[in-house]
A protein has these predicted regions:
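Pyridoxal 5′-phosphate
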Residues: 1-376
C-alpha cells in the first residue's frame, strides 16, 4: 500500500523532526515552497525581540550594540557556504531585480568593447526585463538564444551570459560548470540567478568559477514574503566592480557624509540604502535553519519526495505530462506538469487543502521543499 510505504519513508527520514521547526496549518499540504517558503517557528519571536528590545528599548544604539550595521555582511556570510562561495563574496541587499540591474551594469563596464547580454527566451521575466531596461538606456543589446543554441550564440559581441540555474517553470537545471567554462572560453562573463536553487540543492559558484550570482530569500531560505535578496561577486572581480546605484551605504566612509562617492571595498559597494533590519532578522532565522540541516541532505530528500510522488501518480493511474526532466539530478525541487486544465486543477487542489501553483498557459507546479514536507 502506498500509505504504508509513505509511513516507512517518514520513519526512516533523518530530517523528519525539522518539520516541527515550522508553523504549518494542520489542514494543508503545502507544495508551494518554491514560491514562498513556510514560516520558521523561531521567526516571530526573533522579530518581536528586534522590535521590542533592539528598536523599542535600545533605539538607534542598536546599529552598533545589536550589530544591525553588519547584518548584510553577516547573513551573506551564512548564505555563502550554501552556494559554494567565500563569506566576503556574498552580501544581502535589495531585491533580485535590483541586484540583477547592478550586476548586469557592472559586467558591461568590465567589458567595454562588448555590449550584448545573452539569455534565453522563457527565462524568468525580471531577468529579461532588467536587460531590456538597460537596452532602452542605450547601454546594452539583448540577445536571446534557445537553450540548445546558447553555446553557438557566444561570440565576440557578448559581454555577459545571464541564466537562471534552475528554471522557474520547468525545474530544469543548467550545467553551471560547463556553461561557465564555455562562456569564459569566449571571453564572456556569467551571471547566475539562483532563486530556485539556493537552499534547495548544492551549488558551487567558486568551484565552477562563476563571475556573478543573485538569489532570493523568500523561497527555500524561508525568509518571508519580500525577504531581501543576495548578490555574489567572485573575489577576482572585486577591485574592478563598479555599479550604478551608488547609495550612501555603499560608500567607503558612509558616516563621513562626503559630497563625492568612493566605493566601499568588495561586495560592500553593492549596498545602496539603509538595510531593512526587520526583514533581515527574519531572513537570518531561515538561513540559519537551512544551514543547520545542510543543502546536500535537503536535496537528497527533495529527490526522494518527488520520485515517490511520481510513483504514487503511477500507482493511482493518474497520467500527467511531466515537463521537468525525468532525471532527478537534472531538476530542482519542484515538478512541473502540463495539462490543458492546469489552472482548474490547481484551484481544485487548493480547495482540497493541497497548495501548489499554476503558470500560464498550462503548467501545474508542485514544489517539494524538503525541510518541512513529509512523505505521507
Amino acid at each position: 500500500m502506498t500509505i504504508d510505504r509513505a509511513r516507512e519513508l517518514d520513519a526512516a527520514d533523518p530530517l523528519a523532526h525539522y518539520r516541527d521547526r515550522f508553523a504549518l496549518p494542520a489542514d494543508t499540504i503545502y507544495l508551494d515552497g518554491n514560491s514562498l517558503g513556510c514560516l520558521p517557528k523561531d521567526t516571530p519571536a526573533r522579530i518581536a525581540e528586534v522590535v521590542a528590545e533592539e528598536w523599542g528599548r535600545d533605539l538607534i544604539g542598536s546599529w552598533n550594540t545589536a550589530d544591525w550595521i553588519v547584518m548584510p555582511q553577516r547573513i551573506g556570510g551564512k548564505i555563502a557556504p550554501l552556494i559554494g562561495a567565500a563569506p566576503h563574496e556574498v552580501i544581502v541587499c535589495d531585491s533580485v531585480s535590483v541586484n540583477l540591474f547592478k550586476l548586469i551594469a557592472a559586467a558591461l563596464q568590465m567589458q567595454p568593447d562588448r555590449k550584448t547580454v545573452l539569455s534565453e527566451p522563457g527565462n524568468f521575466p525580471t531577468d529579461l526585463y532588467m536587460i531590456e531596461g538597460l537596452e532602452k538606456q542605450g547601454l546594452a543589446t539583448r540577445r536571446l538564444a534557445e537553450r540548445d543554441r546558447i553555446l553557438e550564440a557566444l561570440d565576440e559581441d557578448v559581454a555577459l551570459l545571464l541564466l537562471t540555474h534552475t528554471h522557474y517553470k520547468t525545474g530544469e537545471v543548467f550545467d553551471m560548470a560547463e556553461l561557465t567554462r564555455a562562456a569564459h572560453d569566449k571571453g564572456v562573463l556569467v551571471l547566475w540567478d539562483l532563486s530556485h536553487s539556493v537552499g534547495a540543492m548544492p551549488v558551487d559558484l567558486d568551484g565552477c568559477e562563476a563571475d556573478f550570482a543573485v538569489g532570493c530569500g523568500y523561497k527555500y531560505l524561508n525568509g518571508g514574503p519580500g525577504a531581501p535578496a543576495f548578490a555574489y561577486v567572485a573575489e577576482r572581480h572585486h577591485s574592478a566592480l563598479s555599479q550604478p546605484l551608488t547609495g550612501w551605504m555603499g560608500h567607503a566612509k558612509p558616516f563621513e557624509f562626503l559630497d563625492d562617492y568612493a566605493p566601499a571595498p568588495g561586495t560592500d559597494r553593492l549596498l545602496c540604502g539603509t538595510p531593512p533590519i526587520l526583514a533581515l532578522a527574519a531572513l537570518e532565522v531561515g538561513v540559519d535553519l537551512i544551514a543547520e540541516i545542510g543543502v546536500e541532505r535537503l536535496f537528497a530528500k527533495s529527490q526522494a519526495l518527488s520520485e515517490f510522488f511520481r510513483e504514487c501518480l503511477s500507482e493511482r493511474g493518474i497520467s500527467l505530462e511531466l515537463v521537468s526532466p525525468e532525471d532527478p539530478d537534472r531538476r530542482g525541487s519542484h515538478l512541473s506538469f502540463r495539462h490543458e486544465n492546469a489552472y482548474a486543477l490547481s484551484k481544485a487542489l487548493i480547495a482540497r487543502g493541497v497548495v501548489g501553483d499554476f503558470r500560464d498557459p498550462d503548467i501545474l507546479r508542485l514544489g517539494f521543499a524538503p525541510a518541512y514536507l513529509r512523505f505521507e
